[in-house]
């Protein structure tokens, strides 16, 4: 079984504290304050939301530290920031700034197409994306304290987040029903470390929280992901690319909390204005699919 150190328990515990909440992408102090006032449990500080990163193309990097510090100074809730996959120095810079979490994120252009960070080397906890139990288990083995679906960021299309959440949860059920002497073969076939699979089998769940991310654009989307077993919700472009960010932010927070109250969700959805413009996944070229980054 994976040896969980005291530091690792603290990191995982910090992520557990966000359970049931909404984490919102913000690009400045004003947006961070809107998110906090709407009830977000944390914010993700970055230069551009995923929809703008997708539209701009080119190489997407860690945000200017000035933006991160501005957001940190504006709110009392935890602040996260993204680094590129495998970028040792971006991660160290963000850690030195004092962020509460680092997202080793496929939304940014990977710095290393072979290696992810050894997240156990850092004091700050990490969140990482996953599409299946193999990716989830590898990130946990590297020291991730929190997971999220990859979805397809910046599209306003929930279909990929749904696919990833269902896939991970189906595979958790499969692992739970395997005999222990069958786990090694399963580990070989999925690329999932055996010790992590053993921990998942014994717990009957992932040992870290798994949030929904990538395509959440409406209160109903958020409630859907919670019903599918998400521990909480990340909203990237869905808030500040909508017609009325303040209303959307509050509505998504409420829908995440009361995800089985359909009358409330109906009322929350009234008069919100237009959600962000969505993208049909089938129209994306292979190189435009952010979820394919990392392994």
Curated annotation (Swiss-Prot):
Source species, domain of life: Bacteria
Q: Where does D-ribose 5-phosphate bind?
A: 25, 154, 215, 236-237
Pathway stated in the Swiss-Prot or TrEMBL entry = Cofactor biosynthesis; pyridoxal 5'-phosphate biosynthesis
* Biological-process GO terms, alphabetical: amino acid metabolic process; pyridoxal phosphate biosynthetic process; pyridoxine biosynthetic process
Spell out the reaction equation it catalyses: aldehydo-D-ribose 5-phosphate + D-glyceraldehyde 3-phosphate + L-glutamine = pyridoxal 5'-phosphate + L-glutamate + phosphate + 3 H2O + H(+)
Group of enzyme by EC: lyase
Active-site residues per Swiss-Prot or TrEMBL entry:
82 (schiff-base intermediate with d-ribose 5-phosphate)
Q: EC annotation? A: 4.3.3.6
Please name the GO terms that the record assigns under molecular function: pyridoxal 5'-phosphate synthase (glutamine hydrolysing) activity
Record InterPro entries: Aldolase_TIM, PdxS/SNZ, PdxS/SNZ_N, RibuloseP-bd_barrel
Q: Which residues bind D-glyceraldehyde 3-phosphate?
A: 166
Give the record's family classification.
Belongs to the PdxS/SNZ family.
- Identify the HAMAP family for this entry: PdxS (MF_01824)
- What functional role does this protein have? Catalyzes the formation of pyridoxal 5'-phosphate from ribose 5-phosphate (RBP), glyceraldehyde 3-phosphate (G3P) and ammonia. The ammonia is provided by the PdxT subunit. Can also use ribulose 5-phosphate and dihydroxyacetone phosphate as substrates, resulting from enzyme-catalyzed isomerization of RBP and G3P, respectively.
Summarize the subunit comment: In the presence of PdxT, forms a dodecamer of heterodimers.
The name of this protein is Pyridoxal 5'-phosphate synthase subunit PdxS
Which organism is this entry from? Bacillus cytotoxicus (strain DSM 22905 / CIP 110041 / 391-98 / NVH 391-98)
Q: What is the lineage of its organism?
A: Bacteria, Bacillati, Bacillota, Bacilli, Bacillales
